[in-house]
Design a protein with these regions (language model features):
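Non-catalytic alpha-helical scaffolds and adjoining flexible linkers that form interface surfaces
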Residues: 2-152
Length: 152
């Protein structure tokens, strides 16, 4: 039996699903993205969205900063970079792009979460806090008091 046949017989990891907030994304080659998510039940996740930059991609318009989406991914057996298979937009938070201050505050909040949350560990309280903060910023200008409250 060849190595490919043995590999094909290995059990596949079950697809996982979660509601997630997109906190970071990078280009990968000409057509793909590496996307970082904050989820309540799986912590911080890194996924690769293959072909996401193609015009007819199923991910078109669904993978932008601060978006909340219901995602599905296939876990990797070799690394912490999983394969994104689905993304259904839940909350685009378009108001965050209305002013530089809102965008800056949202970026600060997501970077704080990225620094303090453990990879692939359940963190529902941080996911909820970030979601509420981004929802508030979607319709309000940031204040020093709001930033301090988030930090506390």
């Amino acid at each position: 039996m060849s190595a490919e046949e043995r590999f094909a017989q290995l059990p596949r990891a079950a697809m996982r699903k979660s509601r997630a907030i997109l906190i970071r994304r990078y280009l990968l080659g000409e057509s793909s993205l590496i996307v970082h998510w904050c989820t309540g039940d799986h912590g911080l996740l890194k996924t690769v969205a293959r072909g996401a930059r193609r015009p007819k991609s199923p991910f078109a318009g669904r993978l932008d900063l601060f978006f909340t989406a219901d995602i599905a991914w296939s876990p990797s057996r070799r690394s912490d970079l999983h394969t994104l298979t689905e993304a259904t937009l839940v909350a685009p938070r378009l108001g965050l792009r209305d002013s530089y201050g809102r965008t800056l505050a949202a970026a600060y909040f997501t970077s704080m979460v990225d620094l303090v949350v453990e990879r692939e560990a359940p963190v529902p309280e941080f996911h909820d806090l970030l979601g509420r903060a981004l929802d508030w910023l979607d319709s309000h200008e940031p204040t020093a008091a709001a930033v301090r409250r988030f930090e506390d």
